[in-house]
């Protein structure tokens, strides 16, 4: 059995770690609330533009934009949204596992894949396991802006415009609630028609100013940018929630470990006292 002094040192070490994890839990809780506010603020715009674009996909368009047309699939692209920091449980690895499975399903069909990575964890992971990385951005912090995402989005849209990509997906975590985050792979190009059954019963006709091509070119790019940004802010809220839960679990585990060490310390202390008493009694008997 370890000595009492050594056990006291272990208890102190765990208590110090527990203070750190508790502080990180509180910081994550505060950041999560702010992330939820940003997510809630941007979600109506993202959903509205998605609905408008869904109407366009179902409508009788004067000009058929390339982003609305299905074509033979030889290469697909993924915009992968991850975190810049760790200590958030299995948030990133669960997302990467889902993505790898999807990439394998395309690979089995002879389709190649390109990756545009957002977040240092994705860059580190795919730098290790391999993958055709065509763009990446890291270090966006806790308050990302659309302008910071333009680089990877532009690279993927240019590849799609030039026919080097035939499908484009966003890979990110959707914030369900504090205890639940869902990894999602969502197709953004070509634009999938709305799955709303009510919309499919209606015919949508639009008048365009100044003309369909210039308006759709701008609108569809804004649509892609808005979906990527929404994916980033949802992923950020998911990150803070996962980190808060992970740090709470670590704090609770630290408390359990301290109790166990305290019992071991008490037993060691009791054994030490018993030994001292035995030595005293033995010494007195010898005299």
From Swiss-Prot:
Subcellular location: Cell inner membrane
Main localization (coarse): membrane
Source species taxonomy: Bacteria, Pseudomonadati, Pseudomonadota, Gammaproteobacteria, Enterobacterales
Species of provenance: Pectobacterium atrosepticum (strain SCRI 1043 / ATCC BAA-672) (Erwinia carotovora subsp. atroseptica)
Pfam family membership, one: ATP-synt
Protein name: ATP synthase gamma chain
Known partners and oligomeric status: F-type ATPases have 2 components, CF(1) - the catalytic core - and CF(0) - the membrane proton channel. CF(1) has five subunits: alpha(3), beta(3), gamma(1), delta(1), epsilon(1). CF(0) has three main subunits: a, b and c.
SUPFAM superfamilies named among the record's database cross-references: ATP synthase (F1-ATPase), gamma subunit
Membrane topology: Peripheral membrane protein
Function recorded in the entry: Produces ATP from ADP in the presence of a proton gradient across the membrane. The gamma chain is believed to be important in regulating ATPase activity and the flow of protons through the CF(0) complex.
UniProt xrefs under NCBIfam families: ATPsyn_F1gamma, PRK05621.1-1
Recorded family membership: Belongs to the ATPase gamma chain family.
UniProt GO cellular component terms: plasma membrane; proton-transporting ATP synthase complex
Entry's Gene Ontology BP terms: proton motive force-driven plasma membrane ATP synthesis
This protein's UniProt keywords: ATP synthesis, Cell inner membrane, Cell membrane, CF(1), Hydrogen ion transport, Ion transport, Membrane, Transport
Gene Ontology terms, MF aspect: ATP binding; proton-transporting ATP synthase activity, rotational mechanism
InterPro entries (alphabetical): ATP_synth_F1_ATPase_gsu (IPR035968), ATP_synth_F1_gsu (IPR000131), ATP_synth_F1_gsu_CS (IPR023632)
Gene label: atpG
Matching PANTHER family: ATP SYNTHASE GAMMA CHAIN, ATP SYNTHASE SUBUNIT GAMMA, MITOCHONDRIAL
């Amino acid at each position: 059995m370890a000595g009492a002094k050594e056990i006291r040192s272990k208890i102190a070490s765990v208590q110090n770690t527990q203070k750190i994890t508790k502080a990180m839990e509180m910081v994550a809780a505060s950041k999560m609330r702010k992330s939820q506010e940003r997510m809630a603020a941007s979600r109506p715009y993202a959903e509205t533009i998605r609905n408008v674009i869904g109407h366009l996909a179902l409508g009788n368009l004067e000009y058929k934009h390339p982003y609305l047309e299905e074509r033979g699939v030889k290469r697909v692209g993924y915009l992968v949204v991850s975190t810049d920091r760790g200590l958030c449980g299995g948030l990133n690895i669960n997302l990467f596992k889902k993505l790898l499975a999807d990439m394998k399903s395309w690979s089995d069909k002879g389709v190649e894949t390109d990756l545009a990575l957002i977040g240092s964890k994705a860059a580190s992971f795919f730098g290790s396991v391999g993958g055709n990385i065509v763009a990446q951005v890291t270090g966006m912090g806790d308050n990302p802006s659309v302008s910071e995402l333009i680089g990877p989005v532009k690279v993927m849209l240019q590849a799609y415009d030039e026919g080097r990509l035939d499908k484009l997906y966003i890979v990110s975590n959707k914030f369900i609630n504090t205890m639940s985050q869902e990894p999602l792979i969502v197709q953004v190009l070509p634009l999938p028609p709305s799955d709303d059954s009510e919309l499919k019963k209606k015919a949508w006709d639009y008048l365009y100013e100044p003309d369909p091509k210039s308006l759709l070119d701008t609108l569809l790019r804004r649509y892609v940018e808005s979906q990527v940004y929404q994916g980033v802010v949802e992923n950020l809220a998911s990150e803070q929630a996962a980190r808060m839960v992970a740090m709470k679990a670590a704090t609770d585990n630290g408390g359990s470990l301290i109790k166990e060490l305290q019992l071991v310390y008490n037993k060691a202390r009791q054994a030490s006292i018993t030994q001292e008493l035995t030595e005293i009694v033995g010494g007195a008997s010898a005299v």
